[in-house]
Amino acid sequence: LIVNILYINLYKPKYPHNNDSSHQMYTEVFNGEYHIRVGKNQQDNDNIVRTSPQSALWFHLKDFPSAHAVVTNIVKPGKYDNAVIIRASTLVKDSAKQGVNNLQKVSVNYLPIKNVRRTEILGQVFLRKAPKTIHI
């Protein structure tokens, strides 16, 4: 029995990808310049982090579980104004589970996705730098 468990753990893929889940992901074009993607589950969150360009911004609620959101400037990569940061933060807040919607303000962390690394746990990430925080 122990041998079978070890076999399963050793040969289980670290990142099981299912490209069919992209239809569940929320996408939006904001002001004709920004592409916003918000995950609806762990697979979407992993796909967002894995497939986003290094110039994109990544968003997540501080201290609460939530969807990941990524904003890409399709006109001027790497340039982001406050309006799109507020919009993406609001989408992340709206995606949160119970407990967060009862709060008047929540904190949303964001930073360039080049400082976000995936972990072996699907949908979880490691931040290489301290994020900026906005209160929504």
Report the location of each language-model feature:
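Duplex nucleic acid-engaging cores and interfaces of nucleic-acid transaction enzymes
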Residues: 2-136
